[in-house]
């Protein structure tokens, strides 16, 4: 292990004497999947979304760093228990009377644009953002900041194309919009299948990561103990959803996002003060303590190896985020389209501020810790933020950052579980099984039961994939959302002729092509960071299928619409256009 930067608060001795460098943890697929030991193709999937790989690597990083500097697991446990206790109390207080579908599914549309915007940003200002982006900047400089740009730009799709019209046209789910003027049964089944599949892939990765984070922070090394940690994390998630519904889940996300933003802002201010509030001084010292030297201030240190895969990833990232079911559902928690605009503006500005702070944190980590120490520490470049936290605040700050990371994961998994349960209860049970005649209380009961089932399945799946590289799950969820959902929504909202065959074709072609291409890609086999690294049956050369599956979904939707029979319903078409543009007649919370 190389020495840290001269004069830094963290040196190589602490790392080498922890034993983690020589342990099996340092050689798992989780660590090997880092940017340092893989190319753009493998890395992009890991950093493009909140993935189990990033979270698990973050957990390894936290444990190694806290062990190295003598952090107390009891402190971490106390912070975890404290956060869970406080948030459960708040969820219970704000969620009384969650017996109607409007209240349980959409919080009665009672949140303001500002509150909803903070909750929206909380879905993405995650442990991966904090650790991954800060670490990428610390090691690679300018190129490490590119993902931040992609995440912010992605929200413009929601602001300009989807948000307002979706809120005005639907009530609770994407299925409401797509099935508005089409045959209800097949379209709602397709929409529910898409939502459940995307949510489960996302949820599986997150719940495994949450359990892994808790297990590693508390120094639980046995498989049985780690399984218990995953089960506990899943149980907490289920409690949030059962007790709180959308209102309670939203408050958890608001609290988590606020903590994360405050934590990042305070660290940034402290770092700027340490360098005389002169960012140039930070950059100058960073170049001296990074093996790349001045190159970290210019593009080209990381990207350019596989342009086509990067374009494919960019498409999935920019077009997928605002097509994710749990994001779409959040547009219904505000009273009108104006508040949707405000929500997205708040979310965008929150993320802009956060990612600007990562510039200071990332370059400061290089300046104070040194890129060599970061790269060779357990967890690779994801160790930048924990090592920096100890350098400036000791074990207490490390514990706080750990608690915030855990809060981040819980907020995300609660939102995903709620989305999946609502989609089944509203689109399948109420609209298809009960043919629109379900009692609100019975529909909410079905939603709660579905949440428990989804939670149990996620726990079991998380235990099964514990310790494996499942980065492809979230990458697949993002590509699925961009392929299956975006094309269907845009056609439904903007193309009068779009019909039931077109909707089914766009959804199922997006789902099928994504799963097929990812199965036969380097993500699953044929590479050292693959799910099955010892075999090679990949035939698709790219790690992200977005560049193929997204256009294919649009094409299939168009072809099926053109060859299918016209579904003339002028009255429904006019009603949909008026509602989409004005919100008149939406009756969302009636």
Report residues per predicted region.
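Membrane-embedded helix-loop-helix hairpins and adjacent transmembrane boundary segments
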Residues: 2, 60-590
